[in-house]
């Protein structure tokens, strides 16, 4: 952190993304992540972003000529759990990890914001997490890919218009095949739209339709 701070100066935000649980044999667990979180906060980092899994260690052996892909083992599964994961599903799956780290950081006398992510696909879930004090910031990847205008729609009071991610991991499947990543909720829509960027095979649009045009 200190080396990075010297490089960018005092007016630049520096945070860290780390795992609340590595989900691999002999890997770090929440107890380790809590310790690291407190040390990161004491060091002066501007935010702590908590994730889970995504390690290469238990990934399946790739086919000849293909790269190792991390989301094929249990650790990778926990990084991007689909809607059929288990009885809990992907919804807010990592929140307890962020909550434990935030609690320890606050008890250590630090106010460093803690970011949580992972299966947070609705405004209600995001707000409830913040109200309970389990995190300070909500991050969303798949939900933002499903609807890049998610935040604008909610702010405008048009939450019913949000194109909600259903966590089938269609996007992850494309990534695993090393194809351009899109969302199945919009990548076949209005393909004849003038000037729309398309995938290499021309079958998918690469950018979601603009909300104003819908």
Task: Place the predicted regions along the sequence by residue.
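Flavin-dependent oxidoreductase catalytic cores
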Residues: 1-214
């Amino acid at each position: 952190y200190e080396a990075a701070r010297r490089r960018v100066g005092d007016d630049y935000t520096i945070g860290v993304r780390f795992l609340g649980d590595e989900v691999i044999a002999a890997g770090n667990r929440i107890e380790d992540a809590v310790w690291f979180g407190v040390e990161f906060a004491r060091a002066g980092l501007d935010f702590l972003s908590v994730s889970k899994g995504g390690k290469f260690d238990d990934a399946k052996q790739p086919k000849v000529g293909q790269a190792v892909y991390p989301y094929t083992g249990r650790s990778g599964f926990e990084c991007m759990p689909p809607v059929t994961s288990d009885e809990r599903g992907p919804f807010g799956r990592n929140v307890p990890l962020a909550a434990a780290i935030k609690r320890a950081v606050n008890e250590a006398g630090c106010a460093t914001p803690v970011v949580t992510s992972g299966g947070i696909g609705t405004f209600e879930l995001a707000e409830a997490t913040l109200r309970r004090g389990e995190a300070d910031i909500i991050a969303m990847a798949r939900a933002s890919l499903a609807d890049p205008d998610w935040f604008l729609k909610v702010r405008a009071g048009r939450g019913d218009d949000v194109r909600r991610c259903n966590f089938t991991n269609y996007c992850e499947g494309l990534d695993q095949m090393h194809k351009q990543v899109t969302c199945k909720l919009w990548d076949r829509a209005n393909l004849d739209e003038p000037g729309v960027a398309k995938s290499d095979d021309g079958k998918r649009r690469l950018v979601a339709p603009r909300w104003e045009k819908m």
